[in-house]
Amino acid sequence: QGAVYQIMQLQKLVNMFGGDLTRRYGQKVHKLTLHGGFSCPNRDGTIGRGGCTFCNVASFADEAQQHRSIAEQLAHQANLVNRAKRYLAYFQAYTSTFAEVQVLRSMYQQAVSQANIVGLCVGTRPDCVPDAVLDLLCEYKDQGYEVWLELGLQTAHDKTLHRINRGHDFACYQRTTQLARERGLKVCSHLIVGLPG
């Protein structure tokens, strides 16, 4: 009871994402996590090896899902969510822009073609968002879909970025965010509170 009351009070002061979606869509909208079978350039040797020090692959969408089609994953995830009937397809695991644009287009299209999908959330690194990917995301935005580019910033301090083995600097994040905003894309920044340094 107390926690619910506190959240209700907080919603009066803060524009929370879930509340914003409910206001705009007239009903609850839930993110359904997807595994696109992507890798990460900080794991496969393109940028580095071993990944970021904090990366916990087990926290991503169920690894078993990567062998299911996008449609099957969405149906499975939707069955787990009782309170929502509209969804955002959330490409979360690894680096969800680390593929050829044709591959991304196919995956994103499979997602938005499913019933009750109102948009895409694409989790990625700021150094893995070339112009062609931004343009692809704009295509979906221009078709009326809710599109969020979710960038893993983690920290704005270059020393800490190096310490956690990110493989990019803060300036890279700033450039990518600027390019996304110039195209009218919404950006969600992922931060880790309490990193050393």
Q: PLM ranges: what are they?
A:
Residues D158, A180-G197:
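Conserved strand-turn element in the central/C-terminal portion of the radical SAM core barrel
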Residues Y5-L88:
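N-terminal [4Fe-4S]-dependent radical SAM core
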Residues V101-Q109, P130-K141, L161:
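Distinct, well-ordered alpha-helical segments
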Residues N82, Q109-A115, L137-E146, R181-E182:
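Acidic (Asp/Glu)-rich catalytic clusters
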Residues Q114-L120, K186-S189:
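Short, surface-exposed connector motifs at secondary-structure boundaries
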